[in-house]
Amino acid sequence: RICYNHQSNTPATTKSCVENSCYKSIWADHRGTIIKRGCGCPRVKSKIKCCKSDNCNL
């Protein structure tokens, strides 16, 4: 699987992953809205969206 693995306002980068899914997590704190992307589907994070196709977590 190929997933995006960059955060918020950093340039888009991708990674070839062993996992069969990608995730995108969005949350807000005193720094503003933070978006994190990566491989797999970590269930410990809140407000996470998982998907199962290449480049699906932009």
Swiss-Prot record:
UniProt protein name: Toxin S5C10
Organ and tissue specificity: Expressed by the venom gland.
Entry keyword annotation includes Cell wall biogenesis/degradation: no
Record-level Gene Ontology MF annotations: acetylcholine receptor inhibitor activity; ion channel regulator activity; toxin activity
Family: Belongs to the three-finger toxin family. Short-chain subfamily. Type I alpha-neurotoxin sub-subfamily.
Its biological purpose: Binds to muscle nicotinic acetylcholine receptor (nAChR) and inhibit acetylcholine from binding to the receptor, thereby impairing neuromuscular transmission.
Gene3D superfamilies according to UniProt: CD59 (2.10.60.10)
Location (main, coarse): secreted
Record-annotated disulphide pairs: 3-22, 17-39, 41-50, 51-56
Keywords annotated in UniProt: Acetylcholine receptor inhibiting toxin, Disulfide bond, Ion channel impairing toxin, Neurotoxin, Postsynaptic neurotoxin, Secreted, Toxin
Lineage: Eukaryota, Metazoa, Chordata, Craniata, Vertebrata
InterPro entries noted in UniProt: Snake_3FTx (IPR003571), Snake_toxin-like_sf (IPR045860), Toxin_cobra-type (IPR054131)
GO cellular component: extracellular region
Organism annotation: Dendroaspis jamesoni kaimosae
Recorded superkingdom: Eukaryota
Subcellular location: Secreted
